[in-house]
């Protein structure tokens, strides 16, 4: 009996030892499982102290591993992941959940022929800056918006600096010189997002923001556009955007040497001017906001300056045998508007100190010969002044023509027609001037 009791005690001790060892092994396994790092996730069933420790560790590491998170990860699988150690769904902490959501909602990237581009998600408001730049004259002092493949290609070929380019079609992007867009932020958008700000009936597939170009920094290819003729166009207070754009387009088509614009002309980078000019801004030098002193300095000393007379009210009936009246003063022509000029600088001057353009011209102007536009009037470098339809030619324009022995070029019209549109008159005279210059064989085509 005693032997039997001793045997039972021995077996019980062994069982107790084995039981204790098994419990320790289970505790070790549980301890190891609890200490196991789960990247970015915490189980719901784990103790609060350990959860806080893991969250603090992953929070410290999240800033270092943001770049390792795959941008194409499915958002649903991130929001409701499953722990490998727990069949129940696990949860992110509030901070880490927001970080991951921000990463997955970021702009994704793509590539076209080695050119990286961003792909904006729908509803992105970055396109709103296009409307702000296009509608603000102050912002256009530094940036301009160009719309359409033709205009953007012309700007890039001339050396203009593109800052941001938006496109809605990969095929349209491939038509651009991609090698000139390596330093440009290229963004893919949906067509409907671009249509929100565009004023065109048919939205373009390419829209770009450029640093405002300067004529001195652009290059104009003679191989592509041909050699320019020695003919300079001067725009005197042309304020209609459509007219100015058409004038610039005619000047580019006629191969003019340059275009000079006085202060008071409409902004050449306004959208309506850009659309009407059809890329003329990047085919020849266009220099805006000049005083008449600046204009004189931009012209060769031997240049002869003529003015366009697109009105016929003072000439009566015209035919091929009509000889224009000569040696008339500028004030004799009704199309020269009655601008007023103040002879003194103070506001309290007597009203008699104000004189109209007509009075000024009667007293001070020399005679300005008038001739039909199709008779010879070019010799060497020639300049032509076109006035705006509202205000006509200024006093300074007439004085410059008189100083250089220029003439008034008359475009005859049938009775009952008062005048020609400024853009039409410019086109007629510029192409006539080109024809005469080429006929002199002073340049080669």
From Swiss-Prot:
Subcellular location: Mitochondrion
GO molecular function, a single term: rRNA (uridine-2'-O-)-methyltransferase activity
Enzyme type, top EC level: transferase
Top-level taxon of the source organism: Eukaryota
Alphabetized SMART domains for the sequence: SpoU_sub_bind (SM00967)
Residue ranges with Polar residues bias: 54-70, 78-90, 311-324
Residues where S-adenosyl-L-methionine binds: 387, 411, 420
Region ranges (Disordered): 52-90, 311-334
Annotated InterPro entries: Alpha/beta_knot_MTases (IPR029028), Ribosomal_eL30-like_sf (IPR029064), rRNA_Methyltransferase (IPR051259), SpoU_MeTrfase (IPR001537), SpoU_subst-bd (IPR013123), tRNA_m1G_MTases_N (IPR029026)
Catalysed reaction equations from the record: a uridine in rRNA + S-adenosyl-L-methionine = a 2'-O-methyluridine in rRNA + S-adenosyl-L-homocysteine + H(+)
EC number(s) given by UniProt: 2.1.1.-
Entry keywords, A to Z: Methyltransferase, Mitochondrion, rRNA processing, S-adenosyl-L-methionine, Transferase, Transit peptide
Entry keyword Mitochondrion: yes
A cellular component annotation (GO) from this entry: mitochondrion
Stretch forming the transit peptide: 1-37
Keyword Transferase: yes
Cited function: S-adenosyl-L-methionine-dependent 2'-O-ribose methyltransferase that catalyzes the formation of 2'-O-methylguanosine at position 1485 (Gm1485) in the mitochondrial large subunit ribosomal RNA (mtLSU rRNA), a conserved modification in the peptidyl transferase domain of the mtLSU rRNA. Also required for formation of 2'-O-methyluridine at position 1484 (Um1484) mediated by MRM2.
Family: Belongs to the class IV-like SAM-binding methyltransferase superfamily. RNA methyltransferase TrmH family.
Name recorded for this polypeptide: rRNA methyltransferase 3B, mitochondrial
Organism: Danio rerio (Zebrafish)
